[in-house]
């Protein structure tokens, strides 16, 4: 694969990139599901993994798409092949990022346990997902069928995430909402309806 990703500038104004990248500065970071479906993301201005690489002191990626992982390794990315529900890198990280991943999983408990095994006392975990209460999804569901991605196993909300993670000793410390569509930001709606995605930061309880 020949693709000079540096030709495409990173979209630092993107709300998801801002939320994640600001927490990566000088940190050791593990990025789960970093391929983001296909190699088309490689040169995309909103590819989270590339933004993290620009800010982190050290970055390791993990994804179950073996061919894509091999291609990205050839382009200088430190990515390993693995499953987000059953990985063991035998080390800890300052920050673990799971961007738009949790809605694809089979077993959330196994995923959280794997994350916990790679966290130290001051580590943080970032989880992002689509917002099921986004105004556009509600409108579409009202007049047509509910918009879904057929690879998704659930709709997750920050409240549900907090309840789930609390059972494993994690607490939510911050939640923000954002959209890739700029016009959403100007709508006179509560943020939980206005934006298409949510981003959460968690830490170990206690």
Predicted regions: what they are:
Residues 27-44:
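Conserved class I S-adenosyl-L-methionine
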Residues 85-96:
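A short acidic, Gly/Pro-enriched loop at the edge of an enzyme's catalytic core
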Residues 2-14, 42, 85, 106-206:
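S-adenosyl-L-methionine-dependent methyltransferase catalytic module, highlighting the catalytic core
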Residues 95-106:
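A short SAM/SAH-binding and catalytic strip from SAM-dependent methyltransferases
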Residues 52, 57-60:
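Short beta-strand element of Class I
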Residues 65:
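Conserved SAM/SAH-binding beta-strand->alpha-helix loop
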Residues 75-86:
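Conserved SAM-binding strand-loop segment of SAM-dependent methyltransferases
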Residues 72:
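Conserved SAM-binding loop
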